[in-house]
C-alpha cells in the first residue's frame, strides 16, 4: 500500500502535536502514565496454615476391658433406690434423710 506523501506529513504533524501535548500534560498530571502501563497482578491470596494435628494414640483392644474403679462409689443415702421400668420409661424413687421422696422418671 502506497501512502500519499501529503498524508505522511499530516500524520507526522498530528503525532508531533499529540506527543508534545502528552509530555506537557504528563509533567503536570503524572497519573496519566497509568493509562499506558499494564496493571500489576495482585499477589496471590495466602491461605492460613492448617492447625497442627495433635498426636493421638490408638487404644488397643485390651485397653477397652472394664477396669475396677480405684475408689468405690458410696451413696449418701441410707435408703435403697427403687427402680421400676417399662418398655418406654424408667422410674427411680428414693427418700432423703429428712423424709422427702424424690422421684425421677425418664420417658424413652
Curated annotation (Swiss-Prot):
Which keywords fit this entry according to its UniProt record? Early protein
Its family remark reads:
Belongs to the papillomaviridae E4 protein family.
Name under which the protein is recorded: Probable protein E4
Print the organism lineage: Viruses, Monodnaviria, Shotokuvirae, Cossaviricota, Papovaviricetes
